[in-house]
Amino acid sequence: MIVGVFANFQKELSKEILDKIVSVLKNEKIDWVLMNEKNKDSVKVNFLITIGGDGTLLNVVEKVAKENLPVLGINCGRVGYLTEEVADNIHFAIKKIIDNDYFIEERHLVEAHFKDKIFYALNDICLARSTFNIIDLSLYIDEVFAQEYRSDGIIIATATGSTAYSLSAGGPIVEPQLGVMVVTPICPHSLSSRSLVLGDDRVVKIKSESDEVLVVSDGRVADTLKKGEYLECKISSKKLKLVRLKKKNFYEVLREKIKE
């Protein structure tokens, strides 16, 4: 077993947590490797641990999706929908991993196709303006024209992402186990533009009617659409294997996090 550790060292407790993890792994004679932005796609591991917040875990979604890796997020950030609150008991958490005393919570991913590229996102794929100008985007569902949006952009969110950017843009909250896409316009120039919730067999195409539209995958710019180009999105057959050390009730977590 080789454990990969990906840490956000801008978080105050990250170094301390990393040292504790490494100490336990060494005592148990478990191989480990410290991952970073440069080597994360090339190193081979069997299990992944992230140290930070939800954003740190989102940073490794592409890797865990492509390699079908289980991932444990240890929270030392602010928002912790996806990560575990075990920073004060690292030895307990790592021992449970070594003993296979955990369960997997599968989360749906949205898969985006553009030219010869494929992007995987746990929260959302966004098409967003690159300047201060409003942009025009045409939405097609299963090749049928559905709507044209004159707005700051469009969010294509998973159920997991429905409590993230999509929620801030006025989208609905969806239970995380549902394999749906939530299409939410960003600051639309029309009162009739509303969110759409689409089933897991739908294929969405978004055509850019404007130049220089940014493609943003889980908060990171992935590419740019030019006028007339399409981005295709669907629920992926790949899923994120999120490691849980104890059962969590979605509505209890939601209530606590929305209060923050």
UniProtKB/Swiss-Prot annotation:
* Binding locations of NAD(+): 54-55, 123-124, 150, 152, 163-168
Question: What does the protein in this record do?
Answer: Involved in the regulation of the intracellular balance of NAD and NADP, and is a key enzyme in the biosynthesis of NADP. Catalyzes specifically the phosphorylation on 2'-hydroxyl of the adenosine moiety of NAD to yield NADP.
- Matches recorded under InterPro entries: ATP-NAD_kinase_N, ATP-NAD_kinase_PpnK-typ_C, NAD/diacylglycerol_kinase_sf, NADK
Annotated GO MF terms:
ATP binding; metal ion binding; NAD binding; NAD+ kinase activity
Q: Which PANTHER family does this one have?
A: NAD KINASE (PTHR20275:SF0)
Q: Name one GO cellular component term.
A: cytoplasm
Its family remark reads: Belongs to the NAD kinase family.
Give the UniProt keywords, A-Z.
ATP-binding, Cytoplasm, Kinase, NAD, NADP, Nucleotide-binding, Transferase
Requisite cofactors: a divalent metal cation
**Reaction(s) catalysed (UniProt annotation):** NAD(+) + ATP = ADP + NADP(+) + H(+)
Biological processes, Gene Ontology terms: NAD metabolic process; NADP biosynthetic process
Chief subcellular location equals cytoplasm
Protein's UniProt name: NAD kinase
Name the active site residues: 54 (proton acceptor)
Q: Where in the cell is it found?
A: Cytoplasm
Q: What is its EC number?
A: 2.7.1.23
